[in-house]
UniProtKB/Swiss-Prot annotation:
This is NADP-specific glutamate dehydrogenase 1. GO terms for molecular function: glutamate dehydrogenase (NADP+) activity. It comes from the Eukaryota. Homohexamer. Its EC number is 1.4.1.4.
């Protein structure tokens, strides 16, 4: 069976490991690869509901419970017409390693439903969520498998799914994360991936410049305009950077003087009503006061002028090899991914070559991979699980502080593994290899200790 997305994720991990001295120094780890690449369990189920016309509809539901050596399965639910087993296996496989880098007790999994929610009423979406959870509730629990949201599953859907679980199981427990604040959710959860991405990038800047530089005065190109992009943009602006772009599936906006926090707030409120950036730019007064250029059908990478930092926050394979070359030509020094697998293998090769072949640190381009750079969301999901188990709610300051600590610790682990197991000479260590090696060792050690590999 052809599984291109999963194969791409698997090949990326394997190439990092093969290209390091890990197997040479510790041959036993090679035995883990064929075991960890096979999910512990794949659940496929039929989901049927009545639509608003009174007709019955059916869709395929999935939960891939990939690996529980480090803790309960943890990973999002995606409701989207593109959902298939290859995509969920790719996301679940990545999730195992990403979750291990948080330092929290979480395994990896992913699930979803092959359905398009666009144009459906609130009532129908509630019926879909209840129908989906009717089957999924047999397979999850706070110590077994704790799903979260993903594409197509936001706060509203999590609410319906949680209500359905409570109804079917007669149990109020922290079985989902991303919950509402007044019924078990965590502060900073919506902001977590975007904030965490910026904290990770800040750690990259600190290391590369010996603490001499920060986001202050940096020009930052961001793609996407959803949660991750919005909160990354707001944090960059707060830290003194200039955000020169945002995008959606129909086009991008470019502002050489900088997109403002007021404009980001307008995008946030308009996106709830599924408005496109083109509509938002035409309708909101903040965009007349501070003009932006809207480019239809384009991604921002080749349209921005000089940039220091690129943060892809939209979707998979959104930066091509040619676009990566354009970013390098425009002076980009740091690239960190807010989206999963945002850069194609060709783009990653461009960034990694620019890093490895730079004659000085000033000429180098440093790439932060998604399994490390965007783990802020799942980190705060883990903190939500911790709060639920104690039936308490932490302050936003405490959650933000814990998030920052997790992102910096993750960066340091990536650096340490890259230095120990790769031969980079004077170049900046490869964070791609560092993240893959550090996370692989953590998961492998747990599997050896528990007899999953022997």
């Amino acid at each position: 069976m052809s599984e291109p997305e999963f194969q791409q994720a698997y090949d990326e991990v394997v190439s990092s490991l093969e290209d390091s001295t890990l197997f040479e120094q510790h041959p036993k780890y090679r035995k883990v690869l064929p075991i960890v690449s096979v999910p512990e369990r794949i659940i496929q189920f039929r989901v049927t509901w009545e639509n608003d016309k009174g007709e019955q509809e059916v869709a395929q539901g999935y939960r891939v419970q990939y690996n529980s050596a480090k803790g309960p399965y943890k990973g999002g639910l995606r409701f989207h017409p593109s959902v298939n087993l290859s995509i969920l296996k790719f996301l679940g496989f990545e999730q195992i390693f990403k979750n291990s880098l948080t330092g929290l007790d979480m395994g990896g999994g992913k699930g979803g439903l092959c359905v398009d929610l666009k144009g459906r009423s609130n009532n129908e979406i509630r019926r879909i969520c209840y129908a989906f959870m009717r089957e999924l509730s047999r397979h999850i629990g706070q110590d077994t498998d704790v799903p979260a949201g993903d594409i197509g599953v936001g706060g509203r859907e999590i609410g319906y799914l949680f209500g359905a679980y409570r109804t079917y199981k007669n149990s109020w427990e922290g079985v989902l994360t991303g919950k509402g604040l007044n019924w078990g959710g965590s502060l900073i959860r919506p902001e977590a991936t975007g904030y965490g991405l910026v904290y990770y990038t800040q750690a990259m800047i600190d290391y590369a410049t010996n603490g001499k530089e920060s986001f202050e005065g940096k020009r930052v190109t961001i793609s996407g305009s959803g949660n991750v992009a919005q909160f990354a943009a707001l944090k960059v602006i707060e830290l003194g950077g200039t955000v020169v772009s945002l995008s959606d599936s129909k086009g991008c906006i470019i502002s050489e003087t900088g997109i403002t926090s007021e404009q980001v707030a307008d995008i946030s409120s308009a996106k709830v009503n599924f408005k496109s950036l083109e509509q938002i730019v035409g309708e909101y007064s903040t965009f007349t006061e501070n003009k932006v250029q809207y480019i239809s059908g384009a991604r921002p990478w080749t349209h921005v002028q000089k940039v220091d930092i690129a943060l892809p926050c939209a979707t998979q394979n959104e930066v091509s090899g040619d676009e990566a070359k354009a970013l390098v030509a425009q002076g980009v020094k740091f690239v960190a991914e807010g989206s999963n697998m945002g850069s194609t293998p060709e783009a990653i090769a461009v960034f990694e070559t620019a890093r490895a072949t730079a004659s000085t640190l000033k000429e180098s381009v440093w790439y932060g991979p998604p399994k490390a750079a965007n783990l802020g969301g799942v980190a705060v999901s883990g903190l939500e699980m911790a709060q639920n188990s104690q039936r308490i709610t932490w302050s936003s300051e405490r959650v933000d502080q814990e998030l920052k600590k997790i992102m910096v610790n993750c960066f340091n682990e990536c650096i340490d593994s890259a230095k120990k197991y790769t031969k980079e000479g004077n170049a900046l260590p490869s964070l791609v290899k560092g993240a893959n090696i550090a996370s692989f060792i953590k998961v492998s050690d747990a599997m050896f200790d528990q007899g999953d590999v022997f």
